[in-house]
Amino acid sequence: MRLLLLLVGLSTLLNHSYTQNCKTPCLPNAKCEVLDEVAACFCSTGYTGNGITICEDVDECNETSVCGDHAVCENTNGGFSCFCVEGYQTSTGKTQFTPNDGSYCQDVDECNETSVCGDHAVCENTNGGFSCFCVEGYQTSTGKTQFTPNDGSYCQEIVNSNCHLEHDCIAANINKTLKRIGPITEQLTLLHEIYKNSEAELSLVDIVTYIEILTESSSLQGYIKNTTSPKDAYFGSALTEFGKTVNNFVEKNTHEMWDQLPTNRRRLHLTKLMHAAEHVTLQISQNIQKNTQFDMNSTDLALKVFVFDSVHMKHTHPHMNVDGGYVKISPRRKSAYDPNGNVIVAFLCYRSIGPLLSSSDDFLLGAQSDNSKGKEKVISSVISASISSNPPTLYELEKITFTLSHVKLSDKHQTQCAFWNYSVDDMNNGSWSSEGCELTYSNDTHTSCRCSHLTHFAILMSPSTSIEVKDYNILTRITQLGIIISLICLAICIFTFWFFSEIQSTRTTIHKNLCCSLFLAQLVFLVGININTNKLVCSIIAGLLHYFFLAAFAWMCIEGIYLYLIVVGLIYNKGFLHKNFYIFGYLSPAVVVGFSASLGYRYYGTTKVCWLSTENNFIWSFIGPACLIILVNLLAFGVIIYKVFRHTAGLKPEVSCYENIRSCARGALALLFLLGTTWTFGVLHVVHASVVTAYLFTVSNAFQGMFIFLFLCVLSRKIQEEYYRLFKNVPCCFECLR
């Protein structure tokens, strides 16, 4: 037993590395300490062992989560340090920390850094990191939905079939293309670069982009002016390259893409293209030194240039043969001229561009412009003729004559000589016009014309029933006169229904609102229908017309429903009925207009008038509700006439059949104009336009306010009595009333 106790005591002493007064040296990672009056070697903090023979480092990092969340532990001799993982930082801003110093790891918001994701991208912070997403209209270069800057991804523009509708997309593509070809300063190389790009498969946005570059880029046209190469062949090559480039933009296989554009946008870009083609051709040709002729012929574009000096001017007759026809320029004769002058005459022929410039969207209330008939089509090539002379008065145009073959037979149709009329400062309003041109001969296959100015020419075909210029002018005067008279009559009606207390009733309330709606519609029409120079203002006017005309229709419908309720003798609550009448009369048109605008706001306002475009059948957002209301009114009309006929026959059995029919006819006529069934002529004019439907529709609707005044006020016995009371105290008026 004593031996066992001795062994235990020795073991304890050894474990404490007992030596008298630590006579045995302690290890470097140990220190001598007195415990219970006994000196011994003990390992320092962070180490374990007997202090004499061994002191091993303690790996604190083996302990789970010793550093807390979002941190990693790093063991050191006699201790450890904590570091925040990527995407986190210490709360105290230190690089490293220990758990007992009050620090912890918190998320770093990388999105606070400007442009951390690069161009056209947005940053989204996440716990311990962030993700990048491309903005609308862009996608990652690697096809990923999200990315980080260090994975090699970046945002690039999405070029798709709908991109042409977005201005930002076009602008971005133009800038990108200019950056790529901008460093090229040599003219032929630049034209060749654009031509080479146009030879590849093109999207609509590519075509529009290159047209904008040709139109707006000063690098091309400016360098043309500064080029001094003496080689005419050099510039001939430039003209060839340029002609092929334009051809690639207008050849037939691009028409399907062009058709994707709204009519006004398509016309705008084609106008820019034709203007740029004419301008650049003249600019290049100015550098040709010799008297020469240049021809270029491609699939859908032909080009011919005459360059001559004043010495050869009398013997040069600029002309161009055009696919079975020709075009010829005749200058004014002069007795004296500058012997050092020079002249350039350029012709371009676009063989297939005509259908893209045909008219399609100019219908409103039966009125059509003399410059753009409702169903006109281009049935020939489009030719361009331009002159540049130095000095400018050296070679002035007297006339241009041309004969063009028809691409379609013109049987039972009339042809017209026309030119593409546009302003260089505003190319949005390009349209066909016949001003300054006259037809000299026409048959089923060819038409000959003579014009007094230069631009782009073509032959138009329109149905023989189309409205002629004289008819259009007459219709315009009828519309203006009728609306002015109607406004006066409607103003009298509004005054009558508003201020004559003796006639106040539900029916006069309906009449008052109907007259107000129609008054505002016709006032906006008279003032703003032709304010088409500002697209935004024109769209607002079209929207107001859409709303007020629909409101007038709604109150017309209410009139029919109310008369039906009276005739059939249904019992109704007056207050409830009035409330619902106002809701239907003013809210339902607003719903229709709002819904239509949300689906196709760009169809409010055309290049001709501030009305709804017929493109994509958008005009039916007005005609549809109008037809529905007309149908409801016609049904109510039938019931009312039937009831009135029976009622009249029952009350006056002694009245002859003629008088009975006349009584019914008077009421029928009143309802016919009052309830707007004359708008049926408008629908007929849309479906089958003719001079007859145009006159019927224009007269019946322009004077609708006058008809309302006649039937609601003049022929009303009660209102006659009110007018008598009003004017009987006025001597001059009383004598007239006697």
From Swiss-Prot:
InterPro entries: EGF-like_Ca-bd_dom, EGF-like_dom, EGF-type_Asp/Asn_hydroxyl_site, EGF_Ca-bd_CS, GAIN_B, GAIN_dom_N, GAIN_dom_sf, GPCR_2-like_7TM
Tissue: Abundantly expressed in heart, lung, and kidney. Less evident expression is observed in brain, skeletal muscle, liver and spleen. No expression is detected in testis.
Domain EGF-like: 20-56, 57-106, 107-156
GO CC entries: cytoplasmic vesicle; plasma membrane
Membrane topology label: Multi-pass membrane protein
Transmembrane residue ranges: 481-501, 523-543, 548-568, 581-601, 622-642, 667-687, 695-715
SUPFAM superfamilies associated with the record: EGF/Laminin
Cleavage (site feature) positions: L454, T455
Compartment(s): Cell membrane
Extracellular compartment segments: 20-480, 544-547, 602-621, 688-694
Keywords: Calcium, Cell membrane, Disulfide bond, EGF-like domain, G-protein coupled receptor, Glycoprotein, Membrane, Receptor, Repeat, Signal, Transducer, Transmembrane, Transmembrane helix
Post-translational modifications reported in the UniProt record: Proteolytically cleaved into 2 subunits, an extracellular alpha subunit and a seven-transmembrane subunit. Glycosylated.
Domain GAIN-B intervals: 292-467
Intrachain S-S bonds: C22-C32, C26-C41, C43-C55, C61-C73, C67-C82, C84-C105, C111-C123, C117-C132, C134-C155, C417-C449, C437-C451
Outcome recorded upon mutating T455A: Abolishes cleavage
GO biological process, one term: adenylate cyclase-activating G protein-coupled receptor signaling pathway
CDD domains tied to this protein: 7tmB2_ETL, EGF_CA
Subunit annotation: Heterodimer of 2 chains generated by proteolytic processing; the large extracellular N-terminal fragment and the membrane-bound C-terminal fragment predominantly remain associated and non-covalently linked.
Protein function: Endothelial orphan receptor that acts as a key regulator of angiogenesis.
PANTHER family: ADHESION G PROTEIN-COUPLED RECEPTOR L4, ADHESION G-PROTEIN COUPLED RECEPTOR
Protein family per UniProt: Belongs to the G-protein coupled receptor 2 family. Adhesion G-protein coupled receptor (ADGR) subfamily.
Written domain comment of the UniProt record: The transmembrane domain is not required for cleavage, but it is required for dimer formation.
This protein's name: Adhesion G protein-coupled receptor L4
Species annotation: Rattus norvegicus
